[in-house]
């Protein structure tokens, strides 16, 4: 059953990493344009020990017009808190802490209206600002 379900689900739904764009060694070049999605998957893996990765699906959206044309940016589609327990703030720049806190603020502002009081309080705690 598990094998059938997995295969059926794979064939029924869009594949998260389908092209035409790909970030890999052997690929066909394709432009990134608004409306496409990519995944942002930073992580670290210690051989034989452990690993951790966060993953967000990002939407490509227009950012600004310049004399060189339109610039794009990535906007997160998946809004999940990032666990602060494993973060060593002394290894982060001020800019990285600002990004992290702005991301968590967005997570809270987008998700909290859909939650009950208990869930909202939990989300408020886990998305509270990261401090040094």
Question: Where in the sequence are the language-model features?
Answer:
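Single conserved hydrophobic/aromatic residue that forms the stacking wall/gate
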Residues: 1-11
């Amino acid at each position: 059953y598990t094998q059938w379900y997995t295969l059926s689900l794979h064939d029924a739904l869009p594949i998260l990493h389908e092209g035409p764009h790909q970030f890999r060694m052997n690929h066909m070049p394709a432009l990134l344009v608004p409306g496409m999605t990519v995944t942002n998957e930073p992580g670290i893996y210690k051989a034989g020990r452990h690993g951790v990765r966060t993953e967000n699906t990002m939407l490509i959206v227009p950012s600004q017009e310049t004399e060189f044309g339109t610039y794009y940016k990535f906007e997160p589609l998946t809004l999940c808190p990032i666990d602060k327990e494993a973060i060593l703030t002394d290894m982060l720049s001020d800019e990285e802490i600002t990004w992290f806190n702005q991301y968590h603020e967005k997570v809270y502002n987008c998700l909290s209206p859909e939650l009950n009081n208990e869930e909202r309080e939990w989300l408020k705690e886990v998305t509270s600002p990261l401090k040094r």
